[in-house]
Amino acid sequence: MTTMAAATLLRATPHFSGLAAGRTFLLQGLLRLLKAPALPLLCRGLAVEAKKTYVRDKPHVNVGTIGHVDHGKTTLTAAITKILAEGGGAKFKKYEEIDNAPEERARGITINAAHVEYSTAARHYAHTDCPGHADYVKNMITGTAPLDGCILVVAANDGPMPQTREHLLLARQIGVEHVVVYVNKADAVQDSEMVELVELEIRELLTEFGYKGEETPVIVGSALCALEGRDPELGLKSVQKLLDAVDTYIPVPARDLEKPFLLPVEAVYSVPGRGTVVTGTLERGILKKGDECELLGHSKNIRTVVTGIEMFHKSLERAEAGDNLGALVRGLKREDLRRGLVMVKPGSIKPHQKVEAQVYILSKEEGGRHKPFVSHFMPVMFSLTWDMACRIILPPEKELAMPGEDLKFNLILRQPMILEKGQRFTLRDGNRTIGTGLVTNTLAMTEEEKNIKWG
């Protein structure tokens, strides 16, 4: 193993790179493997990180950048960290550190949702940089699922584009109620009237998707100018205005701390010498070090214990709903787990294969299907961090479901997954979002339904 390989391995565990307990064992093991002069610096970095404890002294809010590919979402994320780092509110993350997968750097696009943290004077933020490329909408759905609000990035020289619409639609479907707009690349446009037209288009689009288009804060600027320290009006000051708007327009959500904990697993990592880490955003409840838990879904029912919790490299004794965290789990290998599982308090919830739901079928104009569908139509359901093939079972009196209709019908999943009353989901067919819904009831499977052939 090379020094670079070891560093890559450690960077691949963004929530859990340096647990205090057992770090000596980890570092000694790496020293024996590498015998490289560069390692002591790595060791010192890990040792320092291991001592940090997350202090909950401000309200915590989850936000994210959404928008069309190459409109500057990642550049803006980097610029925010740079500006806040000057006052001690963040650690500066370069563009390359946010787009950290080799394929992303090679293609110049964000594929997986990336997470950074920062603090304003009023709040602590976990910021998700959501992928904008059309091929990676599945990852974008996972990225936006836990967001309390979004920053929609639109390039002034392009205006709203296809993924601008799709991201707004998906954000609306999964319950993101507050959006702030950043019109980026204003330095590339000489005509101020063009910028005004772009702003008008954006406000109309927001209204079309059910947001308050006239009230939504729209900030014009250049993330690249902010990042490079040029043109303070378009650069530094625009990002400061954006952060003020996020602080004031996106409310601190009410967190459900009373119910048993529920953590949808976004990713799974292996930390050498320590064990396996699952990451995600705690949907509800309180998760503490030492808690017993179950991991459910995808035909799995695994019982284990949480032996450590971190948020952005800082240790936590307890995590609260809304926290973006990594949890070390006892006695499990990375290959035992996968994204889409849900970590819960033992016995608090069980997977279901059949639900009743209220579903809005998107019209052709909204990017949905052009034609109606019949019973046993098979889209893919997306909810929390999982996706699963399902069958739509229309009521006996309903022969066809038409685009634009709001219907109640049953859904049967290929495998039981975590579903409960009030849970939101999205239905997709190929690369098209066809519907959005809410679970109204969980149902028992009939013998006939248990024998359905899925092919």
Curated annotation (Swiss-Prot):
Residues 1-46 form a transit peptide. The modification N6-acetyllysine is found at residues 82, 91, 259, 364, 421. The modification Phosphoserine is found at residue 315. Residues 108-112 are annotated as: G2. Belongs to the TRAFAC class translation factor GTPase superfamily. Classic translation factor GTPase family. EF-Tu/EF-1A subfamily. Interacts with NLRX1. Interacts with ATG16L1. (Microbial infection) Interacts with human parainfluenza virus 3 matrix protein; this interaction inhibits RLR-mediated type I interferon production while promoting autophagy. GTP hydrolase that promotes the GTP-dependent binding of aminoacyl-tRNA to the A-site of ribosomes during protein biosynthesis. Also plays a role in the regulation of autophagy and innate immunity. Recruits ATG5-ATG12 and NLRX1 at mitochondria and serves as a checkpoint of the RIGI-MAVS pathway. In turn, inhibits RLR-mediated type I interferon while promoting autophagy. This is Elongation factor Tu, mitochondrial. It comes from Homo sapiens (Human). The lineage of its organism: Eukaryota, Metazoa, Chordata, Craniata, Vertebrata. The gene is TUFM.
